[in-house]
Amino acid sequence: MVSKLPQEFRRYLRNRNQLQHVLEETQQALELINLENFFPEENVVEELLSPLTLNRITHILANSPAIIILGQDSKAKAIVVNTLISNDILPVCNGLWRWIRLTYGQTNHISLTLDLEYELVENLQANEKPWSTLPIEDLTKSDNEDITYPTVLEVQLNLPILKDGVQIFIAPNNGAVKVLANEFLSILPIFLYALGEQPLTEQNLEELRDLKETYPFNPVLFISSLENISLNGIDPELTESEQHRLQNRLYTNDSTSSKTDDDSIDFDRMNSLGLSWLDQLTNLGFLGMKESVEVDQLSWLGSGQYISDFVGSCRKTDQILYFIRGCLQTYLINASTYLNEVHTASLRKFILSAFDMARIIQITPKRIQYAQHKENELYANLMKIVHEKQQEITGLIQNIIQEMKNDVLLSNNDVYLYQNTMSNNNQRTEWSATVKAAISEVQRVVLGRLCEKVAKQLVNSVNCLRESFIGTLQRCLLSLEKTYERDTCLLASDALKQILSAAYNVELHNSSPFSIYSFLERLNLIFMSSSLQWSSTHTLDVAWRRKVTIEILNSLSATKLSKIILMQFGDKLESSHDSFQAALRSIENYYSGKLERTEEQRIALRKYHAPRLAKLALESTSMIDVVRYGKPHCAEEIGRGQYGIVFACDGWGGKAGPCAIKSVVPSDESHWNDLAMEFYYNRSIPDHKRIVKLRGSIIDHSYGGGFGFGSAVLLISDRLSRDLYCGIRAGLSWLERIQIALDVLEGIRYLHSQGLVHRDVKLKNVLLDIENRAKLTDFGFCITEVMMLGSIVGTPVHMAPELLSGHYDSSVDVYAFGILFWYLCAGHVRLPYTFEQFHNKELLWTSVKKALMIVGIRPERLPSFDDECWRLMEQCWSGEPSKRPLLGAIVPVLESIQQKAKRSKSLQEVSSDKLQESSTDSRNPALALAEPYNQRGTVVSPPPTKRRTMKVVKYHLFLTNLYIQMREL
């Protein structure tokens, strides 16, 4: 068995090279995405492929595996090595040996190196004379040798067991773990520990503690250098109680010893030395064992990873080979798992970003239209105030003027009239200013107070508009400006906010009462045209100011003031409206280019980047499956389709039960991408009883003789008894067919809940178990709704009309279910008469296109159909997707049909029962499908449970990838 060691290393190197290629492709894909700036202000490479993850992967892929021989003493290590390579290359004796490395060479050669890099010039005894066993002098460590930077004795041997990269390191008795921890050797260690003729010493225990601390996740295989550590009788060195216990075990197990596997450890026949080793190793934590109460014997405790083990004899080389194989597989699985986590996280990020992009593309034009519509409504309502509120404002101004007169006449001082002038009421103060300047100052104070009162009343009149429009409008604009590039559109954005604040948010304060202060210039014209006959006294006391104030208020014309106010208000509204429209056009122009770029990025993610990462994810997860479980054995062929062949398999993946193997050979890059996305979506679907479970995948690179193209992809899934096509042809009862319809509906609903659309629901994609319960399979066209490119895919008869336009959503599965329900109700697999007359696929496809283009051409109604079933079919294959019922609304209809079918034994009896029950049934469940709340395109409030309408994303034709994929019936 140990002769197969080169084969294990060769397989490891081949798989490692494939993983290196996958890593390089992954780095290139992430760097390209980062370069094209799909995710601004994010370093995609560091986010998805973190330095820690990259170091873990490169540590495995850059270093070569090596067998590290540790042990109690040099003699034990020599025995294990000589047995392993089937050659007495090392002398069986003790001594202080240096590091020894055994590799393959065309001729036997020996040299001394420092850190495996620099060859030292030293006279070695092996170079002086022929040798078959290495001289002890060459193996012995010199006294002045530095433990930190050790010298390694390089030994090249022409032995087949050392081919294909096999290398064996024999570690010295002291300081080996520290050298390994420094990673000077650049290896992936596979630890074998040779046990000698005595229990572990304290020095051995300390070395093993360091090994456990330095490599906590690396298993160790402990090998006894003795040929046998079992006993045929009782060891006299044991105590009396131990001898009695072992004696009982010997007698108990004599009868079953012939049935015991030769490779397992017989703890009952282990001598005291073996039991001592097990006790010491258990205390160190290498071997986890517990004593069973029932059988009173030790048993192993295993974990998820490969664990340490014990071999009772160095002659059991098959167990050594099995351990080495497990360690090599663990390294490959770890590297593949790290890579697959990167791929899965990348795909998840891409799909979520595609959802975000689709939402931005849909909602941004709506937001701009909403902002424009709301601003137009606000502008129209405010202008309505300008044209219709003049009389109301005139009366308002008259009331305010009268109130101000009353306040002036009732006031005992001039605080209300003129706060800025410091004067004494008891003496007459001669002003240095002219009377004209004093009058102007009084005018300013009076008009300011008038403006304040009028403005407050005006704010109250438009306050309801501010509450109704401004808040929503500002929130909408804020959402638009979140992604607004401030460096290029700073002025437009700020101007838009200032316009809204100045024109519409009428916030009045005492210091700046509205913008009516700007009316002062025009109001002064009224006073200039008015000839006030005042006495030219220069004594400006309180009485004079009261008199001037009353005369100013009397001279004001409420009609003229209202006209001026409304004219000024209208001018500001018109100016603000024009500025708003200009700023909104600027935003619209900005988003026009941005949305086009977003659509291009979304298409690039869907068509190129996501499939590329999905292909790498397929390779990494296939590596895990092939390393862990190996290639499945393909038995007889059980099916054949357009893209591959399905074989039977007895079992695979560590699970019992038959499985089916779908073998696909991708013909080109597009086929690879489709297959990779199919696998990703199928693998990401959580387990469900109505979905066929995918067990794993294998990429057979030997099929085409090269990497990537020409390889065969094996998709392994659970195997069921037959498909629905064969089931209907063989004959199914009406109750069984109704139950199948419910099962298919449940599976489709579950896919839709996961954001997936099947796009190819048909008879052959529904599998039946031994109880005739249905499960959905074949997710070749399954895809998330946001990742759909408008491709024309599916089986012709089951294709919805909108598939030809390239604009469709999850309702295509409802249409396909309606066609499938036609077959279930018909009870046969013949094509509908509309399509049956065509003898080849080309004519059938032409007929289907005509049928889909012309509304109303659908499968015919058969005489066996009752009204309830036929109405359900018509609703499902409605020409308008919005008129098709929700899947949840179909369930009660099918359940009603099922309940009625249970009360009869044939479909004819069901029809007769319906005629009798029609008078008693208050409502037919099928009629409820016509209700708006059970359809996709209508939003109403009655039902407590309703589904949000799935909006259809419309694309420009030149941005779509319109291609046709057809499958055979």
UniProtKB/Swiss-Prot annotation:
| Domain Protein kinase span(s) in chain numbering | 632-894
The alphabetized UniProt keywords are: ATP-binding, Coiled coil, Cytoplasm, Kinase, Nucleotide-binding, Serine/threonine-protein kinase, Transferase, Tyrosine-protein kinase
Q: Which PANTHER family match?
A: DUAL SERINE/THREONINE AND TYROSINE PROTEIN KINASE, DUAL SERINE_THREONINE AND TYROSINE PROTEIN KINASE
Coiled coil stretches, renumbered: 7-37
Q: What is its EC number?
A: 2.7.12.1
What are the record's GO terms for cellular component? apical plasma membrane; basolateral plasma membrane; cytoplasm
Q: What is its main location?
A: cytoplasm
Catalysis: reaction(s): L-seryl-[protein] + ATP = O-phospho-L-seryl-[protein] + ADP + H(+); L-threonyl-[protein] + ATP = O-phospho-L-threonyl-[protein] + ADP + H(+); L-tyrosyl-[protein] + ATP = O-phospho-L-tyrosyl-[protein] + ADP + H(+)
Q: Which residues form the active site?
A: D760 (proton acceptor)
- Protein name in the entry: Dual serine/threonine and tyrosine protein kinase
